[in-house]
Regions:
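Conserved alpha-helix/loop element of class I SAM-dependent methyltransferases that forms part
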Residues: 47-60
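S-adenosylmethionine/decaboxylated-SAM
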Residues: 14-43, 59-258
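N-terminal auxiliary segments of SAM/dcSAM-dependent transferases
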Residues: 1-11
Length: 258
């Protein structure tokens, strides 16, 4: 059994490191460039993601943790850190082009957000690999570089069988749909799918289109300042995320997929 106190202390320090919190809490914090911060958002998101990770490990939900859209790798590193002290039988899969966004689909392009090449990972794949290694977390994660339409179909042959946590940070409509179509069937009952971009209209459309097409009725829940405890530590619209728990498949020819 892992030492809970030691695990909690380690993960708390890891959150501070990934989001620059150790510097922000200084009496006179240094000015950090955005490239010096590995994570996006704030550590409250990681605390709330940990609630879901704790549950799937405690309940024995089968599968690895997957992040589709990893950017600089902050969240994936936290998931790997969590597994390093809680369940080393699992691993993290982190997918990204590491070279920026693809040409946006028509639905996303109408909004003017995320043009081709935006959100390129500073330093590219090598930088993320180096950060995983510096933190001693590279053994718990596999980075999968490339466009989703090329890499997602290869995940079974790479060794991904089942998923317990699926974090979708794919940004644009087409990439979110590609992620869900390829990976949601691998999400185990009792596992969670988490969306970082639901605040954008094209992301909401992708989520609702996918749920409708597949008859998914699982209750959608928010992590933000107005959420039920303990999911209330993600303050502000830019830090919230949406998630739901996949239900077991109903015994019916017209069953939902959860």
């Amino acid at each position: 059994m892992p030492d809970k106190a030691a695990s909690s202390a380690y993960l708390g320090l890891l959150r501070l490191l990934l989001y620059g919190g150790a510097y922000r809490e200084m009496p006179s914090p240094p000015r950090l460039s955005k490239d010096a911060i590995i994570g996006f958002g704030n550590s409250g998101q990681l605390e709330m993601l940990q609630v879901l990770m704790d549950e799937v490990v405690r309940e024995g939900v089968t599968g690895d943790f997957v992040e589709a859209g990893t950017f600089k790798g902050g969240v994936a590193m936290y998931m790997a850190g969590f597994l390093s002290v809680n369940d080393r039988s699992r691993k993290v899969w982190a997918l990204d082009s590491f070279s920026g966004m693809p040409t946006p689909d028509k639905i996303t392009a109408k909004t003017g957000r995320f043009p081709a090449g935006s959100l390129a990972t500073p330093g590219g794949l090598a930088s993320v690999q180096n950060d995983f290694a510096r933190l001693g977390l590279d053994r718990y994660a596999t980075l999968v570089p490339g466009w989703f339409n090329e890499t997602l179909p290869t995940m079974p042959e790479r060794g991904l069988k089942r998923i317990a946590i699926l974090r979708v940070d794919s940004d644009i409509y087409s990439s979110i749909m590609e992620t869900l179509q390829a990976l949601y069937p691998k999400l185990s009952a009792g596992g969670y799918v988490v969306f970082d971009d639901y605040k954008f209209p094209f992301a909401r459309k992708a989520v609702h289109d996918f749920r409708r097409r597949h008859g998914i009725t699982s209750r959608m829940r928010w992590c933000n300042a107005s959420s039920e405890p303990p999911m209330h530590k993600c303050p502000g619209v830019h830090d919230e995320f949406l998630y739901w728990k996949k239900a077991p498949r109903a015994r019916s020819n017209r069953a939902s997929t959860g």
